Amino acid sequence: METSCFTLLGLLVSLSFFLTLSAQMTGNFNCSGSTSTCQSLVGYSSKNATTLRNIQTLFAVKNLRSILGANNLPLNTSRDQRVNPNQVVRVPIHCSCSNGTGVSNRDIEYTIKKDDILSFVATEIFGGLVTYEKISEVNKIPDPNKIEIGQKFWIPLPCSCDKLNGEDVVHYAHVVKLGSSLGEIAAQFGTDNTTLAQLNGIIGDSQLLADKPLDVPLKACSSSVRKDSLDAPLLLSNNSYVFTANNCVKCTCDALKNWTLSCQSSSEIKPSNWQTCPPFSQCDGALLNASCRQPRDCVYAGYSNQTIFTTASPACPDSAGPDNYASTLSSSFNFVIVLIQCALLCLCLL
């Protein structure tokens, strides 16, 4: 059995080596869930100082308040607010899922300027959030080295709309810094190493590539927004806000408020599509829960072209969860590897 034993050990080493090599960051985010469109986030930074106005223009964000809300900045923040070199700004993007991958909608485009090359556009202009190969692929560019001034290309930023363990999350594209580890990134964003590794198809720090985007799931506040609402799914991460229902409602997400979306009628911004904001309609049914004897609020549940929906808040609020989000995602990939290794070793010992 010595020959068989050495053969099996060789297979074991080869298998482990192959699995390690095959696990690497691709820059693509998996998006295979039932939700085909959603709001996602990217973390943008520039090596040079810039302004919020420039970032808004670059990413084709319709309203500056969308960027302000994603970064929890005051609504009166100027468009010309300076953004320091390497300062990260969270930018909301419209995500679309197709063929198991999520990319930003075609509203983000870039026009080639003098001396531009695709690699420069990807790494410098868009801060490493996308690769030049991906730009070339989706725009069907025959030769990435032959582009002309004035050509306009779609910039396919990575994103996802998938749930995590059945829970809603906000997928955030984080550009990995040189020398970073999964543990550091997990601690920064309130998740765990296993979740980050499995979500991005890697095994550990050795496959973590600097200056490449990593899919980071940010815990989202729970809400009562209906599936047929025009703003569904309304997903916000901690310390962020958004104006919705034609600017008539302001919703905020705060971990200190039990990770529950808080929405109030707002007059801070002029309504769009409606001359005046309709009042929140009255909730039907009793607003006092018999089991926990706590009053139930009438909360925001979405909107249609004609009205704002409301519903009674959940019967009894859950106890406040931890500030960070540590997923219970099972490490099935690692388990399979260990199982195969154990099987080969057992055969070797026979």
Swiss-Prot record:
GO terms for molecular function: chitin binding. GO terms for biological process: defense response. It is a lipid-anchor; GPI-anchor. Keywords: Cell membrane, Chitin-binding, Disulfide bond, Glycoprotein, GPI-anchor, Lipoprotein, Membrane, Plant defense, Repeat, Signal. It comes from the Eukaryota. Disulfide bonds join C31-C97, C38-C161, C95-C159, C97-C161, C221-C253, C248-C277. A lipid is attached at D318 (GPI-anchor amidated aspartate). Chitin elicitor-binding protein involved in the perception of chitin oligosaccharide elicitor. This is LysM domain-containing GPI-anchored protein 2. It comes from Arabidopsis thaliana (Mouse-ear cress). The gene is LYM2.
